[in-house]
């Protein structure tokens, strides 16, 4: 919603979000009734003090990405944590995996994490008592590396809130094992190999659509950029749709992501 949006449920204001690119959520529960609920979003892209103030591209207005209604049990991974999944996977070193979890209303529950390879085989598990911020460490032996366009291999982390044998909520996050660094003399290195970067910059708009592009449009952009022979994409100049980041992970593009 670009770029100032106010959300109402049954006429009750839930909040105002400023900024047109990042995911945001509101809890509808206090304003809902048994039936006949009405969700209203007012959006303006008028001149304001919201970043960016000006740029060499058009600031389209309105609702231009997905709007989702998410229903969860009382115990769930925190949907109000800055629009995230509240499950974060960090491969600190190749094979050494930290998973940070942020549940709510999960006192007395267990957090169960299962890591799976691309074929769905379990490669590691861990459990911990639920807390506002919990984490587990899992060591995956000899992981299959995410290796850019040559081999964009992805694992998944399946995090669950379990209470009395019942799974109350579950979130799956995909990730890859890789190491990288940039050298001022030799450029970009991925998994110990020098990889020359050839790329393009990408905006999120289309003729006659503005920013309201479809998943098929995202997929076509990926295919066209790949056809050019590029292996790198600079996402100008804001957060893009999460779907596009996921496509890049799947395809093997190195991303320059601007915030």
Where are these regions (language model features)?
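Ser/Thr- and Asn-enriched, surface-exposed coil loops between beta-strands
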Residues: 20, 93-97, 130-134
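Active-site-adjacent substrate/metal-binding segments within catalytic domains
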Residues: 1-9, 15-16, 70, 74-86, ...
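Surface beta-strand/loop "capping" patches
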Residues: 74-106
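Accessory beta-strand-rich segments of carbohydrate-active enzymes
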Residues: 1-80, 106, 118, 239-242, ...
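Extended acidic/polar, glycine-enriched regions
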Residues: 32-36, 102-184
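Outer-membrane beta-barrel proteins
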Residues: 55, 89-91, 143-147
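A short, structural micro-pattern
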Residues: 20, 60-63, 153, 169, ...
């Amino acid at each position: 919603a670009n770029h100032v949006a106010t959300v109402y449920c049954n006429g009750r204001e839930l909040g105002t979000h400023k900024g047109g690119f990042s995911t945001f959520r509101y809890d509808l529960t206090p304003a809902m009734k048994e039936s006949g609920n009405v969700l209203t979003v007012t959006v303006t892209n008028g001149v304001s003090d919201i970043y960016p103030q000006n740029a060499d591209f058009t600031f389209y207005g309105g609702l231009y990405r997905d709007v989702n209604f998410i229903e969860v049990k009382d115990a769930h991974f925190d949907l109000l944590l800055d629009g995230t999944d509240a499950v974060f996977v960090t491969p600190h070193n190749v094979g050494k995996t930290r998973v940070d979890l942020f549940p709510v209303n999960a006192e007395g529950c267990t957090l169960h994490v299962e890591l799976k390879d691309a074929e769905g085989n379990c490669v590691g598990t861990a459990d911990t008592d639920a807390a506002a911020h919990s984490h587990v460490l899992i060591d995956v032996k000899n992981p299959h590396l995410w290796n850019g366009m040559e081999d964009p291999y992805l694992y998944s982390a399946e995090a669950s809130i379990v209470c009395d044998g019942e799974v109350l909520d579950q979130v799956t996050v995909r990730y890859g094992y890789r190491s990288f660094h940039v050298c001022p003399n030799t450029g970009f290195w991925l998994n110990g190999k020098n990889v020359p970067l050839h790329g393009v910059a990408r905006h999120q708009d289309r003729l006659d659509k503005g920013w309201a592009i479809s998943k098929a449009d995202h997929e076509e952009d990926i295919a066209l950029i790949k056809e050019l022979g590029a292996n790198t994409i600079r996402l100008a100049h804001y957060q893009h749709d999460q779907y596009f980041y996921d496509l890049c992970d799947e395809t093997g593009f190195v991303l320059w992501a601007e915030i």
